[in-house]
Amino acid sequence: MSGYDRMLRTLGGNLMEFIENLDALHSYLALSYQEMNAPSFRVERGADGKMFLHYYSDRSGLCHIVPGIIEAVAKDFFDIDVIMDILDMNEEVERTGKKEHVVFLIVQKAHRKMRKTKPKRLQDSQGMERDQEALQAAFLKMKEKYLNVSACPVKKSHWDVVRSIVMFGKGHLMNTFEPIYPERLWIEEKTFCNAFPFHIVFDESLQVKQARVNIQKYVPGLQTQNIQLDEYFSIIHPQVTFNIFSIRRFINSQFVLKTRREMMPVAWQSRTTLKLQGQMIWMESMWCMVYLCSPKLRSLQELEELNMHLSDIAPNDTTRDLILLNQQRLAEIELSNQLERKKEELQVLSKHLAIEKKKTETLLYAMLPKHVANQLREGKKVAAGEFKSCTILFSDVVTFTNICTACEPIQIVNVLNSMYSKFDRLTSVHAVYKVETIGDAYMVVGGVPVPIGNHAQRVANFALGMRISAKEVTNPVTGEPIQLRVGIHTGPVLADVVGDKMPRYCLFGDTVNTASRMESHGLPNKVHLSPTAYRALKNQGFKIIERGEIEVKGKGRMTTYFLIQNLNATEDEIMGRSKTPVDHKGSTQKASLPTTKLQGSVQPSCPEHSSLASWLL
C-alpha cells in the first residue's frame, strides 16, 4: 500500500468511522500532491440501522470501483463481509461545477466466524443455552458478593452497560460501546469560550449567534448582532456551496474558512487574510451549527503577518505545537538547502580543481618524462639512470643571430613558436623525448628514459621530419624557408633529475657533447651523422652518403655522414599525415599502409598520427 497501510488502519475503529475520515486523509495528502483530485465520502445511517454511502466526484465513471475497494477494506481491516448496491446516481451542480453523486447501500453479511461456529445439532444448541444460563448465574453471584448496592448506589442503567460489555448475546461477544452523558453541563459560558477561543455558532440561515472574542479581534464585523456568516467568510474546503444543507451533507469533513478581504477594515487591506480550520458540529436541540476551529497557520512568519501571537491560541490547541515544530522543520530544511548549495559549490570547485590538476600534469609531463614526473608527485626520489645506448639529436637555425638582429623580438618569438609546435608534434609521431630547447637549439633523445632497441631509426625519422617542417616556416628577414643544421650521435649517457624548485631531466656524458659537435659542424639543411649513428642506421632502409673525414673540435678527425632520406617511406608518412583516398564509388576510406616502411616508429599518442600505428617493427 505504498507505506500508507498503517495510516489507513488507524482511520477508524469500524467501517463507518473509517469512511467518515477518508476526506480528512485526502486533505492531508493534498498538501503533498497538490494536483490530486480526490473524491468525497459521506456516511449516513438510516433509522432502521442501514448504512448509506454518499460518493461525490468530479470524474464520472469511477463510482464502480468504490464497492470493490470498500468491500476489501471491510474484510481486511475489520474482518466483516459487506455487499454494496447502487441506490441512486445523479449529477449535482456545485460551486466548482458538476459532481457525480452516487448513493450506495452497505449491507453486512453474517459474520465469518459465526458461520464457522454455527451449531450443527440440537444438543449443541441446548449446551450453549446451559452455558449462557450458568454465566448469567455466575454474574449475579459476583454482583452480590463484591458490590454492595446500598453502600455504593449505582443506577440500574449502569448495570445494563456493564452487562452489555461482558455478556454474550446470541452466541457472540458484543463490541458496542454506550457512553454515559451528564444530566447537566458542568461548565460556565465564559470558561467554555476561554477553552475554545476560536469558535462560531450560527443557525440554519447562517446567522451568527455567538463568536469568540479572539475571532472578533481579527474579524471586527462579527461584533455586529445577527450578521450573515457567508458575508465575512468563504468556504475553501470542501468545495461546496455555503449553505446549511451543503455543510450538513459534509459534516464529517474538515472545513477551512477564509475571511473576505473586502469586508475587512481599510487599514487591514495589506494584511494576510485569516484562514480558520476546524470541525462543524450540528446541535439538533438548538437547531444550530457550531464551528470549532483554529487559525490555519504553519510558521511563525504567517503568525507575524496576521499580527497574531501564540498567546491568542489556546494552550490545548495543537496548532501551537504545529507552528513551533514546523518552524524547526523549516530551519532544518534551510540548513539542508545550505548544505546542498555548498555541496554543489564543492562539486564545481572539484571540477575546476580537476581541470587545473590536469593542466599541471600536462605541464609537468612536458618538463619531465611521465614515469619520472609520477615518482616526483608521489614524493619518491628519482635515481639516476645509466643508458648504454641511445641516440641524441641537436638542431639550430642557420644565421639565427643575424635574424635576431634584423627583426623585432615578437617576430622571433612567432617564428620559434611556429617551428617548435611542428617539432613537438613530430616527437609524438616518432615517440622520441624532447629534452629541452634553448633559444633556437632543439634537443631530442631516443632510447631515454625508456630503453628501446630502434632508437636510432626513430631519431633519424624525426630529423627528416624536422627538415620537411622547416620548409613551412618563413625567415622573416629573407622571406625564404628557415634552414636548419641537425646533428645526430649514438652512444651511452647518464640521465637524472636536476633541481628542486624547477626540476629538469638532464643528460650527461660524452655522447651529449659529440651530438652537439655534429650539429655545430654540420651544413644547412643537412642531417649530420657521427660514425656510431651511421653504424646504427646502416642497412635499415635509409639513404646515407659519406661526407668524409673532418676535424671535429675536441674530438680530432672523424669520418662523418649525411642522412638523405628514408627509402621505405613517403613524405606524408614521415610527417604522420593521414591519407584518405577516394575509392571508385566516391566513399572515403583509410589508406592501408605497409607495415615495413618507417623503421622504428611506434604508435603515436595523438589521434591524428594514428596512420603510423601500422609501422611498428
Curated annotation (Swiss-Prot):
Database matches in Pfam families: Guanylate_cyc, HNOB, HNOBA
Subcellular location: Cytoplasm
Region of interest (Disordered), ranges: 577-605
Keyword Cell wall biogenesis/degradation: no
Activity regulation text: Activated by nitric oxide in the presence of magnesium or manganese ions.
Tissues and organs where the protein is expressed, per its UniProt entry: Expressed in gastric signet ring cell carcinoma, but not in the normal stomach.
GO terms, biological process: cGMP-mediated signaling; response to oxygen levels
Keywords: cGMP biosynthesis, Cytoplasm, GTP-binding, Heme, Iron, Lyase, Metal-binding, Nucleotide-binding
Enzyme Commission number(s): 4.6.1.2
Reactions it catalyzes: GTP = 3',5'-cyclic GMP + diphosphate
Binding residues annotated for heme, in chain numbering: 26
Cofactor(s) for this UniProt protein: heme
GO CC terms of this entry: cytosol; guanylate cyclase complex, soluble
Cofactor binding remark: Binds 1 or 2 heme groups per heterodimer.
Biased composition (Polar residues): 588-604
Domain Guanylate cyclase span(s) in chain numbering: 391-519
Record's compositionally biased regions (Basic and acidic residues): 577-586
Superkingdom: Eukaryota
Record-linked InterPro entries: A/G_cyclase (IPR001054), A/G_cyclase_CS (IPR018297), H-NOX_domain_sf (IPR038158), Heme_NO-bd (IPR011644), HNOB_dom_associated (IPR011645), HNOB_dom_associated_sf (IPR042463), NO_sig/Golgi_transp_ligand-bd (IPR024096), Nucleotide_cyclase (IPR029787)
GO molecular function annotation: GTP binding; guanylate cyclase activity; heme binding; metal ion binding
Oligomeric and partner information: Heterodimer of an alpha and a beta chain.
Record's miscellaneous remark: There are two types of guanylate cyclases: soluble forms and membrane-associated receptor forms.
Family that this chain belongs to: Belongs to the adenylyl cyclase class-4/guanylyl cyclase family.
Protein name: Guanylate cyclase soluble subunit beta-2
Species lineage: Eukaryota, Metazoa, Chordata, Craniata, Vertebrata
